Amino acid sequence: MGNIFDILGPVMVGPSSSHTAGAARIGLIARQLFGRQPERAKVYLHGSFAATGKGHGTDKALIAGLLGMLPDDMRIPQSFEIAKEEGMDFVIENKDIKGAHPNTAQIIMEAEGVPAMKIQAHSIGGGRIKVCKLDGIDVNFSGESYTMIIRNVDEPGRILSLIHI
């Protein structure tokens, strides 16, 4: 059974909780996983994100999230201009991603001195999201609770060195 927040949408800049608020959250979680604002981003829109993305502000919301904006940030409609002012280059294209949820975005982020990162996530409605791929590895988390992600080389002592036991 759900709760009242499954019925009421999030406080957000509209028009769509899935295509705008969800997209902003995808961009924001991508930035958080990357650890900083990317200098360059390639954003791919799939399915209904691609079909109605411009009309619902999906493209601007994703860039806003990469800039660190929350879904209720009134600057979302100006995110393209803000990105240019802050020196973040970006490209947004439509892409057919086989087997992906209709509201899927794929983001490749790059910055000097940091390994590139590729994230794939989708908006499930009400401003909620699921991250389904991280650097080509299947994952499943929403960002609604703390999640620890460890990249591990499978060799003796590696995990022990991470957890300091």
Task: Report the location of each language-model feature.
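Conserved small/polar residues in nucleotide/adenosyl-binding loops
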Residues: 163-165
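Conserved phosphate/anionic-ligand binding catalytic regions in large, soluble enzymes, centered on
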Residues: 9-27
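A structural-propensity feature for long, helix-poor, extended segments
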Residues: 46-85
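C-terminal edge-of-domain segments
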Residues: 84, 89-119
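Short, conserved charged micro-motifs
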Residues: 116, 156-161
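Short glycine-/aliphatic-rich beta-strand segments at the starts of folded cytosolic domains
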Residues: 139-152
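Non-transmembrane, aqueous-exposed alpha-helical and coiled segments at domain scale
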Residues: 31-42, 70, 76-77, 102
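Short, hydrophobic/aliphatic alpha-helical segments
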Residues: 1-11, 41-44
